[in-house]
């Protein structure tokens, strides 16, 4: 998953 949260990617690149 590439969800960008608060400016960074979470749960994977």
Swiss-Prot record:
Biological process per Gene Ontology, one example term: killing of cells of another organism
Inducing factors: Up-regulated by infection with E.coli.
Entry superkingdom: Eukaryota
Keywords: Antibiotic, Antimicrobial, Apoptosis, Fungicide, Necrosis
Function field: Antimicrobial peptide which displays antifungal and antibacterial activity. Has antibacterial activity against the Gram-negative bacterium E.coli ATCC 11775 (MIC=64 ug/ml), the Gram-positive bacterium S.aureus ATCC 25923 (MIC=64 ug/ml), and has antifungal activity against C.albicans ATCC 14053 (MIC=64 ug/ml). Has antifungal activity against C.albicans ATCC 90028 (MIC=5 uM), C.parapsilosis ATCC 22019 (MIC=5 uM), T.beigelii KCTC 7707 (MIC=2.5 uM), M.furfur KCTC 7744 (MIC=5 uM), A.flavus KCTC 6905 (MIC=10 uM) and A.fumigatus KCTC 6145 (MIC=5 uM).
Protein's name according to its UniProt entry: Periplanetasin-4
């Amino acid at each position: 998953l590439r969800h960008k949260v608060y400016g960074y990617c979470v749960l994977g690149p």
